[in-house]
Amino acid sequence: MRDQLPHDLVPERVQRSSTAPNPRSISSTGQQRPLPPGGVPLPPALDAEQRFLDGPGPRVCLYLSTPEGVGGTRDATPLVLVHSVNAAASAAELRPLFERYAAVRPVVALDLPGFGQSERGPLDYSPAMMTEAILRTVQYLQGLGFRQPVDLMAVSLSAEFAARAAMAQPHWFHSVALVSPTGLDSVRLEPYAPERTKEKRVLRQVLENPLWTRALYRALTSRASIRYFLKRTWGSMDIDQQLLEYNVVSACQPGARFAPLAFVSGALFTPGIANLYARLPQPVWISHGVRGDFTQYDALSHMRSPETWVVDVFGTGALPYFEVPTLFASRYEAFLRKVEATRDVPQWRSRMARAALASPDVGTGTVRAEIKAACAKLRVLAAEGF
């Protein structure tokens, strides 16, 4: 079963932060959502223009930079950034990346549903919902007039959502970068099962028991707990203090507990995701660190990875772009240069053609026509052996 894909976005449903109601106090329906007693309004995660995608699906907050000059033209390749998933996740986790690239190319970072300034509350959180948020973001960029496929970078569990999105709409994505991706910790590669999750239902029931669910969430998101989990992520005492402060405020927003509890129960993980990674038709960059809790990538040594893969390992924790930003950027940019140098090789074109033929035919009539034309051209090129 393929992922459910988004409907076309209606331009009027996209609101600029300059004209929209205060995003710190509204829901997707426009109703005021009160802060808890003593609560602090959540400021923007990034110093950038905010946009909000209203339906279909949960309201999604975007942080957008379209610099003047070459990087801001509609022929430039946008970079889409997706944060990880944890008890206090948000686009604030992407700050070093956003700040580095915002001045030189179009960049958009999103708050996934249930996090940051996107819609929160008791929603049906699932991998399909998160995947759809990424696809809606790319579709929005297309609506702004950006003509090039995007470079996609996702962190930790969001790598799974990114892979699903890239497989669902292969021609929307120029490359896929997975930072500390989940699903590569075991040498036993189970079949990919997009219609299922790794949810433990008994655990989910325990977590959501009204007798203690609020107290449990408060314990998981206290300042001490958030600091503890960041230290485990960094594998070091030297965490980013600005991220800590933002996470503390983000975790206490109204409706904040629902998505993290779905995450803890396993409801956002997809079985066999490693097999999907290996099938991605786009060039893939995988990077990870060697410290902390996220260092098990045994599957990488047992997978027959495509020639279009590049794997870089940093002597850091799970978020290397915080600790070695210059080195991280240089490795990523080297990967992008390699993508440009090899994108016309027969193997790459053949993989894209096969993926396009297998992907659903969705989107606007223009997008459908472009995909069909590209598929036909790629079939001819592959047959001729170019």
Feature roles, as predicted:
Residues 167, 176-212:
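Flexible "cap/lid" loop of the alpha/beta hydrolase fold
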Residues 66-69, 95, 109-153, 330:
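Active-site loop/oxyanion-hole signature of alpha/beta-hydrolase fold enzymes
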Residues 316-329:
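Catalytic histidine-centered segment of alpha/beta-hydrolase-like enzymes
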Residues 154, 158, 162:
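Gly/Ala-rich beta-loop-alpha elbow adjacent to hydrolase catalytic centers
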Residues 214-278:
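Conserved alpha/beta-hydrolase catalytic His-Asp/Glu region
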Residues 64-117:
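Conserved HGGG/HGGXW glycine-rich cap/lid loop of the alpha/beta-hydrolase fold
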Residues 279-316:
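Conserved loop-alpha-helix segment in the C-terminal half of the alpha/beta-hydrolase fold
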Residues 2-52, 63, 353:
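An N-terminal hydrophobic leader/cap segment in hydrolases
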